[in-house]
């Protein structure tokens, strides 16, 4: 399940099931059947793997709005699905909500796509956004008509939680990490924007200054081979780097709780087309009570406070090394930043907060 699908699944789970009808594509028929049986709300499937605003999809949507008496239509991916907003309103919808995820920044930079965003804005009552950065980049493209509402993913603070020192050492034993290791974890897709290469380039300097440092890279992606080759260039450093691949949500939580620092020095690429919309992983790490090192791309800096994390230039490996070494060698700072991060998430980023925000928009 991709990021947008997960986002929508988690938000829909917060709504009264008797008031919800989901119209969705079918990526995997068997998985779709199992999912649909497991949820308490009604799911209507479009047979194709991809849902685009075609005449067939529009007709099915209109029929569903009429048959179910739908008053609010929520387009889970504004671009391009919300071009069907006029048809939804003509079918009886009173409120149109269109949700953005970050890729609309790229659309706003291309004249033809920008005009599509303007059309969506003219016919939507609410456009939601995941970060102030993305709003700044595309607000003018959507125009003045819609109300803009901040609606990022929430964090499950019962699944992502901190542990005490004894529990941390027990987790490390299960994960094969030494008690005295200084563990830096990065969990993300292995793609150029995320900055795992910067961490690997920084690591020889980190190990030179902190011999107990350990870098744990979690995730899969198209640059894994390149990253492994980069890590192998320095024998001493490479022995302290592990590639964990894809892990379960349970194990990812264990890794975050057992780590000293979370680092993902993301950077903007492609002249602004490839940018970090927000970065929920930064918030999940803070919920687990560990300091965060975030790259200065897009909305990533909005996830941390000066008390809970450090924002770095994702292209400056030496600067990243300096920040990491400075942090892991200060146990008191690790603890205070971890506490601050947990409180930051509990106060501002829980699903309870985000769910209430969504419910306030629905008529």
Identify the role of each PLM range.
Residues 1, 6-53, 134, 139-141, ...:
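N-terminal strand-loop element at the rim of the active site
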Residues 75-81:
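Short His-centered aromatic/hydrophobic patch
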Residues 257-275, 290:
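Acidic donor-binding loop of glycosyltransferase active sites
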Residues 319, 326, 333-347, 357:
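A short, well-ordered alpha-helix in the C-terminal region of glycosyltransferases
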Residues 133, 154:
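Carbohydrate-associated surface elements
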Residues 296, 305-317, 326-332:
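Conserved acidic donor-binding segment of nucleotide-sugar-dependent glycosyltransferases
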Residues 225-253, 260-261:
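Nucleotide-activated donor-binding/catalytic signature segment of Leloir-type glycosyltransferases, i.e.
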Residues 172, 178-194, 200-204:
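Conserved donor-binding/catalytic core segment of Leloir-type glycosyltransferases
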């Amino acid at each position: 399940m991709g990021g947008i699908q997960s986002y929508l699944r988690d938000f829909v789970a917060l709504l009264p099931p008797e008031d919800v009808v989901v119209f969705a594509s079918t990526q995997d028929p068997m998985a779709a059947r199992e999912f649909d049986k497991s949820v308490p709300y009604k799911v209507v499937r479009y047979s194709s793997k991809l849902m685009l605003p075609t005449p067939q999809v529009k007709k099915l949507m209109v029929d569903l709005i009429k048959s179910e008496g739908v008053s609010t239509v929520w387009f889970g991916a504004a671009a391009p699905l919300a071009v069907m907003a006029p048809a939804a309103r003509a079918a009886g919808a009173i409120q149109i909500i269109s949700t953005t995820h970050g890729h609309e920044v790229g659309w706003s930079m291309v004249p033809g796509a920008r005009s599509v965003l303007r059309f969506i804005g003219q016919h939507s009552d609410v456009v939601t956004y995941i970060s102030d950065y993305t709003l700044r980049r595309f607000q003018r493209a959507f125009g003045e008509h819609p109300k803009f509402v901040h609606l990022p993913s929430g964090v499950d603070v019962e699944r992502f939680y901190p542990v005490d020192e004894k529990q941390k050492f027990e987790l490390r034993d299960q994960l094969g990490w030494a008690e005295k290791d200084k563990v830096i974890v990065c969990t993300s897709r292995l793609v150029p924007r995320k900055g795992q290469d910067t961490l690997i380039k920084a690591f020889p300097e980190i190990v030179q200054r902190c011999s107990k440092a350990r870098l744990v890279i979690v995730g899969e992606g198209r640059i894994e081979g390149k990253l492994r080759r980069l890590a192998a260039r320095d024998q001493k450093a490479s022995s302290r780097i592990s590639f964990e691949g894809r892990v379960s949500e349970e194990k990812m939580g264990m890794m975050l709780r057992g780590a000293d620092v979370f680092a993902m020095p993301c950077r903007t690429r492609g002249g602004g087309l490839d940018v970090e919309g927000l970065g929920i992983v930064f918030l999940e790490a803070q919920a687990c009570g560990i300091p965060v090192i975030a790259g200065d791309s897009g909305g990533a800096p909005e996830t941390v406070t000066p008390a809970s994390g450090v924002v770095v230039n994702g292209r400056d490996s030496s600067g990243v090394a300096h920040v990491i070494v400075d942090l892991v060698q200060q146990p008191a700072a690790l603890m205070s930043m971890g506490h601050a991060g947990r409180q930051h998430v509990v106060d501002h980023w829980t699903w309870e907060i985000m769910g209430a925000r969504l419910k306030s928009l629905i008529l």
